[in-house]
Structure formats: structure tokens, C-alpha cells
Amino acid sequence: MGARASVLTGGKLDRWEKVRLRPGGRKRYMMKHLVWASRELERFAKRHHGEQQSKTESNSGSREGGASQGASASAGISGNYPLVQNAQGQMVHQAISPRTLNAWVKVVEEKAFSPEVIPMFSALSEGALPQDVNTMLNAVGGHQGAMQVLKEVINEEAAEWDRLHPTHAGPIAPGQLREPRGSDIAGTTSTLQEQIGWTTANPPIPVGDVYRRWVILGLNKVVRMYCPVSILDIRQGPKEPFRDYVDRFYKTLRAEQASQEVKNWMTDTLLVQNANPDCKQILKALGPGATLEEMMTACQGVGGPSHKARVLAEAMSMVQNQGRADVFFQKGQGAGPKRKIKCFNCGKEGHLARNCKAPRRKGCWRCGQEGHQMKDCTGRQVNFFRERLAFPQREARQLCAEQNRTNGPTDRELWVPGGREEPGEERGREQSISTNLPQITLWQRPLIPVKVEGQLCEALLDTGADDTVIERIQLQGLWKPKMIGGIGGFIKVKQFDNVHIEIEGRKVVGTVLVGPTPVNIIGRNILTQLGCTLVFPISSIETVPVKLKPGMDGPKVKQWPLSAEKIKALTEICQEMEKEGKISKIGPENPYNTPIFAIKKKDSTKWRKLVDFRELNKRTQDFWEVQLGIPHPAGLKKKKSVTVLDVGDAYFSCPLDKDFRKYTAFTIPSINNETPGVRYQYNVLPQGWKGSPSIFQSSMTKILEPFREKNPDITIYQYMDDLYVGSDLEIDQHRKKVEELRQHLLKWGFTTPDKKHQKEPPFLWMGYELHPDKWTVQPIQLPEKEVWTVNDIQKLIGKLNWASQIYPGIKIKQLCKLIRGTKKLTDVVPLTPEAELELAENREIVSTPVHGVYYDPDKELIAEIQKQGNCQWTYQIFQEPHKNLKTGKYARQRSAHTNDIRQLAEAVQKIATESIVIWGKTPKFRLPVQKESWEAWWAEYWQATWIPEWEFINTPPLVKLWYSLETEPIPTTDTYYVDGAANRETKTGKAGYVTDKGKQKIISLENTTNQQAELKALLLALQDSDQQVNIVTDSQYVLGIIQSQPDHSESELVNQIIEELIKKEKIYLSWVPAHKGIGGNEQVDKLVSAGIRKVLFLDGIDRAQEEHERYHSNWKAMASDFNLPPIVAKEIVAHCDKCQVKGEAMHGQVDCSPGIWQVDCTHLEGKVIIVAVHVASGYIEAEVIPAETGQETAYFLLKLAGRWPVKTIHTDNGPNFTSAAVKAACWWADIKQEFGIPYNPQSQGVVESLNKELKKIIGQVRDQAEHLKTAVQMAVFIHNFKRKGGIGGYTAGERIIDIIATDIQTSELQKQILKVQKFRVYYRDSRDPIWKGPATLLWKGEGAVVIQDQGELKVVPRRKAKIIRDYGKQMAGDDCVASRQNED
């Protein structure tokens, strides 16, 4: 390896010559160590052959030794496992040594299929024959999942070998070796002598090297599975336990460099998609909302060691019967001409199936039949354990019989090709397959008579059994022992091959196992040859259960009168719908009714039936809108072939829940009440009912799912009844697929009328016009009107909004101003000059057609924004210049006072959201703003949670900040204290300022408010001050407006202030609390308050501030405890530098039952704090624990349960919470433990939020405590008893006590109510002497009782009521004792 000739020696060689065996690997090896290892491997591999070689050489002499060497060299055989020539001149094989096997097993156990395993296998198996390789593989005890994956790869490679090396028909010449098949190379069907013969032949066939190459391919696949570099590489092995797969999945997921949203998506999709087929079927059955706990419970026992046990049992039986004679496959002819490799999957030449990028073709690659994959095919299979006993050779690609049927049975049935014999037919002749196939129903056990080698018996057709097992039958011929696994364990059976079986008149030959079985079974090995298929009948579309809202009844709205022509039209429409089964006639027993009416269709004389479902919609349960928006053509990828379909009578093809149909009843009246009205109810989804869109979308998705899975190369966009079908197929193939789709929909009752079947462009779809390489909106005509109504303006704005997605530059702000306020649709609206100008510009824009292009996933998305003025923005999203994907506008003004940069930021967030919806990613932004202005804004704009990737583009007008506020007071300039006041009753006020130099100015105001007066005072100070000024105000309103740095406003007064601000060189604005004795502020406050407002003496301010400095109470607590106005309490909190709250997190809904606590561990200053939160009240228990262990956690839970009633705790899946100690504590204290979703903090939302709150309070009081545990308890005290708010305005401590007390009172009250309800009341009115009743007793007071009689609530004086216990119907006689018992 070059170390001997190195110029470096000693320590230098050690320092510099370092080698990584694996690219990117951590371990590095010294060159001399690698040289030593190579010598040791070479010496070690030859050591155990030395003795026999020396004997051979001494007996046969140098000539034989030379010949042996020559033979070996010519065959290219390594010295690791030499083929030596014995004394008789025969080539013999030296078996693999135990030391080599031990080294291999140790590698696998220590490395666990890490990448190092592959070079180790390659080195240890150098020169090995297939038998040696199988010996190595059999030595691996565990890792059956990996072995199964390896076995599948070998099966695929063996099948590929058979395809590329076909055998020739005819006998083999004497002395000539047969051609090796794939299973021969794998050592399954070949002897050791045959392997030696192939290896030493001239020319040689290196079967050992070929087999090693297959194994290395399989090991690569296993290594990728066990050591993934990305979450996308995680796959569950076929026999791998689901638990192990989940462990690997989450371990890799933690290391993924992705956002939490992406990780959540990976968990929701990849975990199920990459499970093995058995687990995936179970997981899909659980539904999309299944928790990880439910998944692991459902998949328990799937995979694992059971497969390994069965294989080992079979191997043991093979070993015990090694004395049996070997019977080999018949030898074939020499190899034919080499052919190009061809993929089993896609049929294309040039690559193998394992490297194919196309979606996997359904069905078996070997026999072509669906229902199994090649690895499960009943043809020849490779097994690591060598089966040396006799079994017949099968054709590798023999196709099973398959029948094409058009009419399926109504029940789930087994179909067997070949009918029963007719009485007059000869029983001995073979029957031809007819269309009159025997049908065996599965409503009962399918037991049928079977002839096995002429012996009649009864057997069960079992599609779940691999093998055919018969009991108590005598068969002739050779047999071999076998052990099979059943429900009760393993049973020993005899395996007979080539047995003749006759079922339903059809004869087949197959393998039968004879042994003790509870029932005779015909398994899949025979059913497949019979062509037997399991038929699942296609049922009608599954109905979605629907209910009314709780406590509501159906609609009972009377039908209003209708004209004669409408009654006639409705009668004809309903008669036709009844024939089609869409509606059914009902009788008078249905008490519900919804009014109907009729309108004429546009441009037609035909009538259209409408049902006024408004009342039913109010009473129907809410539905989740399955599809939240319409698909956009800018998100479509360019397709070679496109078709647009429309589903006819979409809603009327979906059935309505039978229990809900009665609520859709309606009535067709008669003229002059000639006859009773004809009553109908809907059997299908009605038009206008709130549930129809969601149910239809869900049903259509389920129906299209099988077609999508079968045709992954077809893109189908589905929105309601519009279908877009695109593909990259040639037009003829594409149209065939479209016809398949139409037939698929037709089977489910959905028609696609030819009238709306669009085959050629342009395609009209969802209001768009699609061309092969571009798209646009359908032609837009803006109306020309002299008089505009509100309704006309609304329609016009709708058209312009629709056009703006491809026509850049459209503005609608002035048009929207025309219809502000509450106006009738028919009110006439005069166009303002600004609106007329805006409309004219828009006409000019839409007069020239504009087209968009389709999305290319390989190119970058770019969004460019321009300012149009007047708070309006336009943008274009494109991938290539001048080829827009789509355009849009933004004109929303969230605040009355704003600036261009804030609006630009809002527009960027809107475009980013839109891009994620359409393309799944955000674009790169080009913004008309200087970098300094943009970064200055974002630095202060703390509400921002995301800053986009962007670049500057010089597109006038540029956006900039027109002025900025200083962060520190300006020392050399005047300070203006400003204030304003107004009287709410008289609307009069004053505004003014006082400077630190004694200058002052006060003006009087009319028809003003406090806020306007405050702003006017600021304006006065700005107008009278120099270029640099300090301004102090006590108004949060003024401070909030100016600190947002607006450059335009809807308020004229604010616009004047902005103009003055722009003129200044430097401005410093500060806030101080009012009425605190602050010099200038107090002075100006007295000036402007004189005669305007009454200032209350708030003596609680000082005490409130003192308490806040100590406990940092929130404003609600101070307002309540010290009788302060909310504004004053808020100002005290806002002025505290430790209580500047920057927004609050949004929370979802959690279970707030009284006994539920959320528990979590958080970390601070390197220590562990365990926190328990009472969910309903927000009350906290927390303490510092020595370590995050199960023992400490259990001790804390027991203390918590000793203080408060704890019914349920909700924790995460941390090891301390899942420990046995915690489980034991919960069991003892009778606490139910629930777990959140792993790695999803939202499932622990309450405690996660309060962890942050607790840390914030600790930070506020940390300097008051020496130890962290002291600060934690101080923070708990402050949170529980010094912070008010939430439900009831209580502190958390008051709230938990109130909740527990209320819960106890409610429970006791419920007991009393249940006790009271056991009594019945007889009563009488003052005017009626007859006793009435019995009525139900609801409440018993001191002077009266509350009863319910026939649904009516009544209050009856105690003296006029008799209360008796309800003893049941057996004592209901008039003279019974109960009738005379009076509770009084």
C-alpha cells in the first residue's frame, strides 16, 4: 500500500498518513495499520489450508502442484478458499473455516449492518463458492428483517439471470455440464460438485463471484435501511417489528435539519407510507387522526421473530434428513447469445428493476398476475437453507389462469373457472372453461368435496393459507418431512409432490401436505392453479351519517303560494326525479317541510326547481370544508395531453343518509287547494343544502383514489364536479386513460356527458382558459353604464378582482370607497372623478389579452412588487422574465395610520402565503426598498416572525422611511410636555404644552375628544419647536401612533403631524404615567384640565407601584386590589422594564375538566424544574428536583396528589414519565396518565405556555433570591396569588378553589336532583278541584314545588301538591298504598 516506500518515517508517518476507509467517516486509520491488516488477512486466510496443501504437494509432486496452481489461476480463484487437486487428480473444495465464520458473525453483531459490513463481507468471502456464502449467511442468527430484504434482492437477481440466460430445449450431451440457472447460482438447486465444475470449466462460469455480487447488492440495500442518512431513506423491513421501525424513524427525524412544520408533515405522511405492506394496511385502517400509541398497539406482533422461528424449524428438519438422496434439476443446453438487460417494472432496456425510477408496476414481475409480488410468487424461490430433497422444477414465468368478467356477483364469492359437469356428460373428459363459472358464497364456510389422487374428501377453501393440508389420506411415492406453523403452533407433516387434485371438475397437479390438521385445507398453491379468484362486489357509494345540531328539530316552514305555471313545472320536474330515484313520495307521517319555488333558466324557457334550505341549514350539524380553495392554473405543470371533464348531476349521484332524508321533505301545492299537496323527500344530496359540497367532495375523492393509485402518471385536479386530467402520454394513449376514468366513474353512477367533455384546447376550466403552453382568465367584458347601482359596482369589483390574477396593475380602491357603509343593492351610486379615472385605467389594462405560463418545478420562483400609490400595490410571480405565472394586487390597510414599509411587509406575507398554497414553497422577493430602510424597520418591528429572502430592485417609486425617532433624549434642546383634555358631555376641550424653560401654550377646542386633544397638543409642540426637540406625553394613544412611524393616515390631524415630523432633524418621544407628580407633566395637566375634567385623587397608585415592583402583578390584579382605572394599571405595567410583553401565543382547545393536570420538566440555570399545571384554572405547583428521573417524578406526583384532587395527568413521552416508578405512583393514587404527541409541543400547550410564564417571573424576581429553588417558589406564589385575569377575573389560586368547590356542589346537587326525580306529584289548580298528575318533580322548595307535566313547567304551592314515591307500574292501582302516601 505504499507505506514501505514512504519518505516519512516514525512519528511523522503516524501524524500525516491517515486514511478514511469510508467517505465522510469519522474514523481514520494509520497507513501502517492498514498494511498490517492486509497482511494479517492474507496470512490468516491461507493459514488453515497449509497442512493439506503440503500433504497434497508431497504426494503428487511439483508437477501436480503446478497443475493445480495453474488451474486455480486460470479460473481466477483467490487463495482464500482454494480448490486443490487430490491424489486422484480431482478438484476438491476446502470448506470455510470456523475462524472466518466467527469473524463474520462478530462483524454483523458489532456493526449491525453499518457501511463497514460490506467491505468486510467482500474480504472474508473472497473466492468463496455459493455454498460458502450461504454458510456465512446462515451463521447470522438475528436480523431476520435484513435477511428477508437480502433474500428478495437475490430472488430478483436470480430471475434477471434466468431472463438473460435462457435454456435451450433438447438433451444434454454426455459429459457436458448443464447451464446454471439463477437458483443454481444462489446454491439452492445446485450441488457442490456442480459449483466446482462451473468454476473450473473452460471457459469458467464464476458462480461464486456472481452470487457474491448479488449478496453485496442486497447488503447495500440493507445498509441504507439500517443506517439512513435522511428521513426519506427510512423503510420498514418486511419482517421488522413496527416498534423498531418507529425507533429508527424518530431517531433520524430528530437529526433532520428541518422546521417543526416539515417534521410534523414527515411524521404524518412518511411514517405510514414507508411502513411494510402489512403495517401500512393496519395504519391506513386506523385513519388519519391516529396517535402513535394507537399505531404501535395495532401493529404489535406484526413482523418480528416468528418468521425466523419457522425458517429455523424447517432448517432443523432438513438437517435431520441429510441422508436422503439428492435429485437435481434437469440439465440445460449451453448459454445462448447475450441480450440487453431489460427492466421487469417499466419494460425499458438499459437498467434493472431495482434501479427503475418509474412507479412500481402492480402485480408479480415473474408470472404477471396481480395479488402478489415476485418475492411471494409460487414459482422457484431462493432460500439460504439448502433444500436438497426432491421437488419438481417449475417454469419461472408461467402465467396463472385469469378470467375476464363483466358482471360481478351480488355477494362476496369465490369464482372457480370451469363449470360443474352436467348429468349427461362424460365425467372423465377435461372440461373447457365456460362463462358459467361456479360461485361459492362466503356467507358460510366454503367446504366442498375434493378428490385427491382419486380419494374423495371434504376440504375448506382457504385463501389465507399458503399450503394445502389434508388429514387421514394415504398417498403413494416419496415424501419429505416438513414443519409448518399454524394458529396452535408448529405441526409435523409429510410433503408429497406431483399429487393430482380434482375440484369442481377441474384437475390440477400440485403439492399436498399430509398431517394432523383440525380441518382439511385447500391453500393458495392449488387455488392459484385453479384460477380461483376472490370477488368483492362493488357496493353503492357509502353514505355519510348526518345529524341535526343537538337539541334541534327539523324545519317546519309552510309552503308559500305558487302560480299555476310554476306548479306545473315543478310537478313535471319532480315526476322525472322520482323516476330516476332522486326523490321519493312520502305520507302525512312526516311533520317536516321546506318551501320550494321555481325560476326560469337563463336564455331558456325551461324551469329550474329551487328549495329554500335556509332553515334546514341552520339546524344541520356543521361540516368541515374538505377543499379549502380552488386549484390555480399557475400551479399546474405543463402537460403533453390535457382533457377537461364535467360530472353530470354531481350531487344527485351521491346518496343521502337514510335517517336524515325525512328532514328534506317538501310539498308541491295545488291550485285553489283542489287536492292535498304532493309530498316528497330527497334520496340524494340536495342542491342548496349546506352538507352537499363537503359530502360530494369526500365521496369523489374516495372514488378517484383507486384510479389515481393505478395510474400514478395521470394528474387529476378535482374541484366539485370539474375534473382536469393531464398526462405526458401521447394523445391516443391519454384518451384511452380518460375513457378508463369515465368508465370507472360510471361504475359508481357518475356520468361525464359528452357535451362537457373537452378534448381540444382551449379548455374552459374553473373560470380559466387553458392552452397547451399558457393560460388566462376567460374573456372579461367590463360593462358600460350611465347609472351605476351598488349591485353593479359589486359585480364590477368582482370581475376586476378575478382579472387581477393575470392582468398586472389593476386598482379598485376608489371603486370600493363608493359602496362603503350600509346601502341597498338597488341604490344608485354616482362615480367620483377618482373612481372614473380608476375604471378607465382598468378598461385599458383588460383590453389587451394577457397570458400566464405553467409552473416548472426545476426553476426558482421570483416575486416582484411595485407600489402604485394611494396604498395600493401590484406584484408578479414568475420563473423567467416577462413570463408571469400569476399576478395580483394588495390594497388592504390594516390600520388607519400606517407607512409604506409596513404595507410592503404585509404584502410580502400575503404573497408568501399564497405561494405556499399554490406551489408549496415561498418565492425570492424583489422589493423596491433600500436595504437600510428595510432592515431598520424589521429591527424594531417585533411582531415579525418571519423575514423573507429578498433583493433590492430599483423600480420607482422607491419605499423609504421619511423620518425616524431617537432612542435617547437629545441633551442640548428643549423638552415639551404635551397634554390634552376634553369633556365628554360638552365636547369642549383644551390642548397645550409646557417646556422645561417655562414656555407654555394652551388653546381651546370645540367638538373634540380626549384623543383629538392629545394629538392637537403634539401638533402644537411640533409647530412651535426647533429642528431638534424632546417631547413628553402621558398618552399611550399618541405614543402608539407615532412609534409606528406612519407616512400617511386617514386622519387629517395625523397627516399634519406627519408633515411636521418630516421637517424635523431629530425627534425624541417619551411617555410618562399621568398624575404621578412628574414636574412638566403635572403642570401641563393642570393647565389643560382646568374647567374641563375632574381629576380624582388616586391614593392607591403608590401602593400599587410598590407592590408591582415587588411581585410584578399584572394590571388586572392591581386594578382590582387598589381600585385603579384599567388605563392607569396598564400604564404602570407598561412602564416596568421587566414586564414588556411582546405578544401572546395562540392556544388551541384542551380538556379543562376539574381533575386534569399537565406535567412537564423544564430547565433553567442547568437545573431541572418540574411543573404541574391545573388546566382548568392555570394554578401551578413547581419545584427544583435533583435529577430528571422516574423516582423524583413519582415523588412529586404523590405530593401533588396529597394536596389536590388529581384524576388525570397529561405528560410527554420522556423517560422519566414513562418509567415504572411513575406508573406505580399513578396506579397507587388512582391517577390516569395520558401522553402527548411525541416532538409536538402543542399537545402540552398549557404547561409549555406556563413554563415560559414561570421563567419570565423567575427572571423578574431572580435578583431577590440567592438560590434558584427559592426564586421558583417565589414565582409560583406570584403567579398563583398576585396575577388576576381569565375566567371570573380571579387569581389562579382563587380559581382552583372555586372550581373544586363548584364541582363538589354540582355533584351534590346532581345527587339531590336524581333523588328528587324519583318522586311523582299529584296537584290541583285553585279553580279545579280534580287532582291532576302524576307529574315529574324537578325541585322542592320551602313553600312551593317545580313540576313538569306533559312538557309544561309549573310552580305549585306545597299545600296543593301531593308528593309520592314512584314504585313502578305494578302498584299503579287507584287504591294502592302509594296513592295515599303524602310526603308532607
UniProtKB/Swiss-Prot annotation:
For bias type Basic and acidic residues, the affected ranges are: 410-430
Q: Where does Mg(2+) 1 bind?
A: D646, D721, D722
Per its Swiss-Prot or TrEMBL record, what regulates the activity? The viral protease is inhibited by many synthetic protease inhibitors (PIs), such as amprenavir, atazanavir, indinavir, loprinavir, nelfinavir, ritonavir and saquinavir. RT can be inhibited either by nucleoside RT inhibitors (NRTIs) or by non nucleoside RT inhibitors (NNRTIs). NRTIs act as chain terminators, whereas NNRTIs inhibit DNA polymerization by binding a small hydrophobic pocket near the RT active site and inducing an allosteric change in this region.
Which residues bear the site annotation Cis/trans isomerization of proline peptide bond?
G170, P171
Q: Where does the record place the RNase H type-1 domain?
A: 970-1093
Sites binding Zn(2+) sit at: H1108, H1112, C1136, C1139
Q: Where is this motif: Tryptophan repeat motif?
A: 934-950
Q: Where are the zinc fingers (Integrase-type)?
A: 1099-1140
Q: Where is this motif: Nuclear localization signal?
A: 26-32
Active site (record annotation) = D462 (for protease activity)
Which ranges of the sequence are coiled-coil?
none
Q: Which reaction does it catalyse?
A: Specific for a P1 residue that is hydrophobic, and P1' variable, but often Pro; Endohydrolysis of RNA in RNA/DNA hybrids. Three different cleavage modes: 1. sequence-specific internal cleavage of RNA. Human immunodeficiency virus type 1 and Moloney murine leukemia virus enzymes prefer to cleave the RNA strand one nucleotide away from the RNA-DNA junction. 2. RNA 5'-end directed cleavage 13-19 nucleotides from the RNA end. 3. DNA 3'-end directed cleavage 15-20 nucleotides away from the primer terminus; 3'-end directed exonucleolytic cleavage of viral RNA-DNA hybrid; DNA(n) + a 2'-deoxyribonucleoside 5'-triphosphate = DNA(n+1) + diphosphate
Where Mg(2+) 2 binds, per the record, is at D979, E1014, D1034, D1085
User: Per the entry's comment, what about the domains?
Assistant: The p66 RT is structured in five subdomains: finger, palm, thumb, connection and RNase H. Within the palm subdomain, the 'primer grip' region is thought to be involved in the positioning of the primer terminus for accommodating the incoming nucleotide. The RNase H domain stabilizes the association of RT with primer-template. The tryptophan repeat motif is involved in RT p66/p51 dimerization.
* Name of the protein described by the UniProt record: Gag-Pol polyprotein
Protein's organism? Simian immunodeficiency virus (isolate CPZ GAB1) (SIV-cpz)
Q: What is the lineage of its organism?
A: Viruses, Riboviria, Pararnavirae, Artverviricota, Revtraviricetes
Q: Which gene encodes it?
A: gag-pol
